[in-house]
């Protein structure tokens, strides 16, 4: 675990974080919670993008933090989407209790001001890459989060 205040560029630079919000548009309550949480997010951070289709290009170096609305599956999908450009992820659970997304939306409202000022801890997870080779040729490659 790492203290985010020692690693987060926005804290070191004294600026608001640039945040991407990722959510699965087909999940129950996603749109309702987006409408409720976006003003709160925007009051403490600069909203870079809202991605409801897991298609955002994370290769841009400008983003600081990803908020995922959903469950563990949504966080795993976001980690795959970020590939080699991993950012800290704050998972907000909109379904059953999750291992990675253990923060419920009501609690998010309480802790968000602390997160943006670096008063939180980041748990680092290992990313795995698996490639399949046939006759010396790479046929496919997948990346995943080791939870």
State what each model feature region is.
Residues 2-70, 74-85:
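N-terminal glycine-/serine-/threonine-rich phosphate-binding loop
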Residues 20, 93, 143:
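Conserved beta-strand segments that form the floor/walls of ligand-binding pockets within enzyme
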Residues 26-27, 94, 104:
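Short, glycine/serine-rich, charged loops/turns that create anion-binding
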Residues 37, 77, 83-86, 104-111, ...:
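Alpha-helix termini
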Residues 44-48, 91-94, 114-117:
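Glycine-rich loops and low-complexity Gly/Arg-rich segments
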Residues 77, 81-95, 99:
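Gly/Ser-rich helix-loop-strand patches that form or flank binding pockets
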Residues 99-147:
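Catalytic core of DAGKc-family lipid kinases
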């Amino acid at each position: 675990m790492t203290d985010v205040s020692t690693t987060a560029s926005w804290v070191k630079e004294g600026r608001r974080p640039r945040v991407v919000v990722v959510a699965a548009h087909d999940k129950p309550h996603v749109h309702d919670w987006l409408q409720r949480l976006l003003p709160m997010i925007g009051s403490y951070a600069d909203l870079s993008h809202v991605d409801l289709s897991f298609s955002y290009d994370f290769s841009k170096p400008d983003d600081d933090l990803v908020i995922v609305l959903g469950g563990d599956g949504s966080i795993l999908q976001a980690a795959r989407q970020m590939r080699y450009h991993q950012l800290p992820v704050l998972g907000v659970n909109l379904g059953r209790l999750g291992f990675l997304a253990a923060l419920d939306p009501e609690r998010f409202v309480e802790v968000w001001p602390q997160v943006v000022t670096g008063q939180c801890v980041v748990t680092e997870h290992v990313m795995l890459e698996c490639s399949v080779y046939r006759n010396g040729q790479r046929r496919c490659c997948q990346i995943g989060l080791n939870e």
